[in-house]
Amino acid sequence: MRFLALTSLLCILLLCLSFFSAEGRRHPRNPAKPGKIRICCPRLPGPDLMPQKGHHMRICRPCKFKQKPQLWVVPGALPQV
């Protein structure tokens, strides 16, 4: 009986310790490196962005556009005013 009580207290203590030790930490998925930040450019480049012969063009990533959230209707719900 004592062994069961001691193991349950130990498990609770370890659980609390693991929770509070990781609470303030943040794990970024893609940490940004200061020298590796790329600007975004439009998907269809204009004539001013076209590279000329012998000139290097700045490497950029395509811009991401935020899509509007699609509205969904709950069947049988009354319209809200």
Curated annotation (Swiss-Prot):
GO BP annotations, alphabetical order: angiogenesis; defense response to fungus; defense response to Gram-positive bacterium; G protein-coupled receptor signaling pathway; lymphocyte chemotaxis; mast cell degranulation; negative regulation of cell cycle G1/S phase transition; negative regulation of cell division
Q: Which GO terms describe its cellular component?
A: extracellular space
Instruction: Identify this protein by name.
Output: Protein GPR15LG
Alphabetical keyword list: Antibiotic, Antimicrobial, Chemotaxis, Cytokine, Disulfide bond, Secreted, Signal
The signal sequence is 1-24
Q: Where in the cell is it found?
A: Secreted
Q: Which GO terms describe its molecular function?
A: chemokine activity; G protein-coupled receptor binding; receptor ligand activity
Coarsely, its chief localization is secreted
> InterPro entries attached here?
GPR15L
What role is this protein assigned?
A: Highly cationic protein that has multiple functions. Acts as a chemotactic factor that mediates lymphocytes recruitment to epithelia through binding and activation of the G-protein coupled receptor GPR15. May be a tumor suppressor; together with SUSD2 has a growth inhibitory effect on colon cancer cells which includes G1 cell cycle arrest. May regulate keratinocyte proliferation. In addition, through activation of Mas-related G protein-coupled receptors (MRGPRs) contributes to pruritogenesis by activating itch-selective sensory neurons and mast cells degranulation. Has antimicrobial activity against Gram-positive bacteria, including Staphylococcus aureus and Actinomyces spec., and Mycoplasma hominis and lentivirus.
Q: What's the subunit arrangement here?
A: Interacts with SUSD2; the interaction is direct.
Listed as disulfide-bonded, the cysteine pairs are 40-63, 41-60
Lineage here is:
Eukaryota, Metazoa, Chordata, Craniata, Vertebrata
Organism name: Sus scrofa (Pig)
